[in-house]
């Protein structure tokens, strides 16, 4: 147990919490512009062509973001919104694109889990 005098001379160190999404700088989302839209392959044992894009954010960061859902309308110079959330089988992809916001359209024909893919309730 440290004495009061020892603590005055050298206070206890605070734990440093490292963020998993540094480009967001504490914000829930950030806006950015697509600089490159492409597909990439996941780590073993998975196999697919995952849709990702390189994004230049408003704060100057350049990050790789995952495009979720079936089909998308993104191309170079599309303005998009990104949120945190990594893709476990894609190394270096720590952000997701928010579907149904700005230039990114929602997923067509989506019936379940609509809120995650920017789809309005279907008219009956």
From Swiss-Prot:
<dbReference type="InterPro" id="IPR012340">
    <property type="entry name" value="NA-bd_OB-fold"/>
</dbReference>
<keyword id="KW-0689">Ribosomal protein</keyword>
<dbReference type="GO" id="GO:0019843">
    <property type="term" value="F:rRNA binding"/>
</dbReference>
<comment type="function">
    <text>Interacts with and stabilizes bases of the 16S rRNA that are involved in tRNA selection in the A site and with the mRNA backbone. Located at the interface of the 30S and 50S subunits, it traverses the body of the 30S subunit contacting proteins on the other side and probably holding the rRNA structure together. The combined cluster of proteins S8, S12 and S17 appears to hold together the shoulder and platform of the 30S subunit.</text>
</comment>
<comment type="subunit">
    <text>Part of the 30S ribosomal subunit. Contacts proteins S8 and S17. May interact with IF1 in the 30S initiation complex.</text>
</comment>
<dbReference type="GO" id="GO:0003735">
    <property type="term" value="F:structural constituent of ribosome"/>
</dbReference>
<keyword id="KW-0820">tRNA-binding</keyword>
<comment type="similarity">
    <text>Belongs to the universal ribosomal protein uS12 family.</text>
</comment>
<comment type="function">
    <text>With S4 and S5 plays an important role in translational accuracy.</text>
</comment>
<protein>
    <recommendedName>
        <fullName>Small ribosomal subunit protein uS12</fullName>
    </recommendedName>
</protein>
<feature type="modified residue" description="3-methylthioaspartic acid">
    <location>
        <position position="89"/>
    </location>
</feature>
<dbReference type="InterPro" id="IPR005679">
    <property type="entry name" value="Ribosomal_uS12_bac"/>
</dbReference>
<keyword id="KW-0699">rRNA-binding</keyword>
<dbReference type="InterPro" id="IPR006032">
    <property type="entry name" value="Ribosomal_uS12"/>
</dbReference>
<keyword id="KW-0694">RNA-binding</keyword>
<keyword id="KW-0488">Methylation</keyword>
<dbReference type="GO" id="GO:0000049">
    <property type="term" value="F:tRNA binding"/>
</dbReference>
<dbReference type="GO" id="GO:0015935">
    <property type="term" value="C:small ribosomal subunit"/>
</dbReference>
<keyword id="KW-0687">Ribonucleoprotein</keyword>
<dbReference type="Pfam" id="PF00164">
    <property type="entry name" value="Ribosom_S12_S23"/>
</dbReference>
<dbReference type="GO" id="GO:0006412">
    <property type="term" value="P:translation"/>
</dbReference>
